[in-house]
Structures are given as structure tokens and as C-alpha cells.
Amino acid sequence: LLVMASGNNGTDCDKKIYYPQGLDKTGKRIDNLIRIGASDINGNPGSISNYGKNSVDIFAPGMDITSLGENNGYTTSSGTSIAAPVVAGIAAIIRDYFPKLSAGQVKEILIKSVTPMNYKRVKIPGLNKKGNVATYDSLCVSGGIVNALNTVKMAQQLSSKKNK
């Protein structure tokens, strides 16, 4: 599974194309590429995160994340390049514990097992001086934020069905 940061322009990727788009030559979604947006500690999309109802698959924590820095120190960073490794790590756990699942199945599980945020009206990322709001299902395919526990549970269910 290829995990890709969607970008940090606060742009609707359904309207402005960023490559790779995650589509094959015929326009069909590629099942082994997942595009990630960044969310903050309150579950809101990051103000810089790209988004798109059809072009960003899932949001993950990616704003004000503290990690290791230079000289045995720490650093705080934000963006979809911070959120993408969160999803990659969860995908790696799934592939390790459930190696018979395909990349496409792992992507589907990640998308279907989110913490749904469709009910929450959030500020649309970008230079949003008008205060425009939307629900998560208009900002990404999954309509929510990655949930590691739900992902493991769903993978376990799917894997046990395949083994019967």
C-alpha cells in the first residue's frame, strides 16, 4: 500500500489536480494508493491540509505533532507529511498481523474503520477568511479520521471470514 500525503496548500484536490491522482489510465481509482489529509487535536482538518471528497481518502493526526529532532531533542511539525506516517504505521501493523490481506483490502479497511466525523461541521482548510464550513464527508472519501483500534478489529473480522 502506497501512503501519500495529499499536500499542504489548503486546496480542494477535486478541483485542482495534484499528482499522483490515484487514478489509472481509464480514470478508475487505484486500489493500492491512499491519500491522506491532516487533522488537529480537536478532530478538525488542518488549516493547511489539502482535501477532496473524491481525491483525499482519509484524515489523520498531523498538526502540531511532536517527534524526535536533532541533537537528541524534539521538534513539532505540522502537515500531511506528518499525517501520512500515522496511516502508514497502522497499515504496517495490519500487513504484519494479517499478511494475507491485499493492499487494496488494507486501504478499504482503513477507509471503512474511521472515526466518523460526518456530523461535525468544520472550517474548510485553506485561506478561509469567510468562515466557510463543511462536513467531513465533503472533505474526504471516508468522512472521518483514521482509527487504529477499529482498523485492527475490522482486519481481524475480515481475516477470520477468509479463513473459514
Predicted regions and their residues:
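VWA/integrin I-like adhesion module and closely mimicked acidic/polar interface patches used
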Residues: 1, 15
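Active-site environment of divalent metal-dependent phosphoester hydrolases
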Residues: 9-14
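C-terminal subdomain of the subtilisin-like protease fold in secreted/lumenal serine endopeptidases
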Residues: 31-35, 98-164
